[in-house]
């Protein structure tokens, strides 16, 4: 029986935060998720004197996407002086408000978008199956290259285990935080739980990983699906525990109060023994993270400059060292290769959705 997807009423809030020497800009942004109110907060940071390029991040302050965009801007501004990168948070609809805004800008506008795979999954599902209203076309975004490759981790509280979570999912269902319904987090964990004969409900309205994690801390959800960076400190303190890596490779790197641990996976040699042995969960593993994108039709010279800068950023230890420190992955694709990878990922997401029917 096809699970019913409930319509969402999201309060879209736009928080504008300029990273490098740019005062905040207030205003209202209309998106498919509703009207967005603006709150401005500016950081005292010296501009490098270059032409301003905004990196529009559709996720909340303190989450991995936000921190990554800021590290990227910081690194790029130190490596060259032709462009001054600033970060603007435009929240609402787990990225939909920002994507809609970006798609309606003139193609010559020198903005970049944090363009994640999960956003594209929801876009394609909405366009194909009508799962939600989509007021933008993802072909209006043109990826420069990948900046974020992550392994989703399922976290819970120390009083729970993977076994207890699976049992609860099969007997009434569990609540999760981590994006909106049918985002990559939900498609991955949701399809896995469905294959196990259980149910997952996404508690939405959180903007970014920091708020989603707090939902678990506050007892509003049973599990939080987030990045390695998002709950690293809580794992070290013993207040949250990682119970499953949505990967086919054992995840190493977490340190608990009792020492280093290895997080089991959904497939492969390190598959968690609590999962059904006769079920192949490899289709639940989807690419996670994303790209920075220009407008489709943007000036080619500008795109070439952005590509050159991205390659320099990835080659700089300030960026790749930070990526390694928060246990994200150094994964680089550019231009057409990045677009092809994204399109292939969306095909996999449509197949994962079949498990939710």
Residue ranges and their predicted role:
Residues 156-174:
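Flexible hinge/capping segments at coil-to-helix
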Residues 38-140, 181, 196-234, 317, ...:
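N-terminal (or domain-start) structured segment
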Residues 50, 194, 236-237, 298-357:
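An extracytoplasmic/periplasmic, membrane-proximal ligand-sensing/linker region
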Residues 146-155, 175-195:
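Extracytoplasmic ligand-binding site segments that recognize negatively charged/polar headgroups
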Residues 1-54, 357:
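Short, low-complexity disordered leader/linker segments with a strong preference
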Residues 60-62, 117-118, 152, 156-161, ...:
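Short coil/turn segments
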Residues 110-113, 133-153, 175-177, 241-243, ...:
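A structural signal for short loop-to-beta-strand junctions that line the ligand-binding cleft
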Residues 235-314:
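C-terminal lobe and pocket-closing loops
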């Amino acid at each position: 029986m096809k699970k019913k997807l409930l319509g969402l009423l999201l309060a879209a809030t736009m928080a504008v935060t300029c990273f490098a020497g740019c005062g905040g800009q207030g205003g209202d942004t209309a998106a498919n998720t509703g009207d967005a109110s603006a709150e401005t907060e500016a950081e005292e940071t010296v501009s490098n004197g270059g032409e301003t390029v905004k990196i529009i991040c559709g996720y909340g302050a303190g989450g991995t996407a936000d921190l990554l965009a800021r590290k990227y801007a910081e690194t790029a501004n130190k490596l060259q002086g032709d462009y001054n990168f600033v970060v603007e948070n435009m929240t609402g609809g787990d990225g939909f408000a920002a994507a809609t805004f970006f798609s309606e800008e003139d193609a010559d506008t020198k903005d970049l978008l944090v363009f994640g795979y999960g956003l594209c999954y929801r876009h394609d599902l909405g366009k194909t199956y009508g799962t939600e209203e989509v007021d933008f076309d993802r072909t209006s975004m043109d990826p420069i290259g990948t900046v974020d490759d992550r392994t989703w981790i399922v976290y819970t509280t120390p009083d729970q285990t993977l076994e207890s979570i699976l049992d609860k999912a099969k007997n009434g269902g569990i609540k999760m935080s981590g994006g909106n319904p049918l985002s990559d987090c939900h498609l991955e964990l949701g399809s896995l739980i469905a294959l196990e004969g259980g149910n997952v409900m996404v508690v939405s309205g959180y903007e970014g990983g920091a708020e989603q994690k707090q939902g678990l801390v506050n007892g509003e959800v049973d599990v939080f699906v987030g990045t390695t960076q998002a709950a690293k400190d809580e794992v070290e303190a013993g207040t949250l525990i990682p119970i499953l890596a949505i990967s086919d490779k054992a995840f190493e790197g977490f340190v608990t109060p009792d020492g280093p641990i290895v997080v089991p996976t959904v497939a492969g040699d390190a598959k968690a023994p609590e999962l059904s042995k006769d079920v192949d969960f490899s289709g639940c593993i989807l690419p996670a993270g994303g790209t920075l994108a220009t407008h489709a039709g943007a000036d080619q010279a500008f795109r070439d400059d952005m590509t050159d800068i991205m390659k320099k950023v990835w080659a700089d230890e300030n960026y790749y060292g930070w990526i390694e420190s928060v246990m994200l992955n150094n994964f680089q694709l550019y231009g057409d290769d990045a677009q092809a990878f994204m399109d292939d990922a969306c095909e996999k997401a449509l197949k994962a959705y079949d498990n939710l029917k």
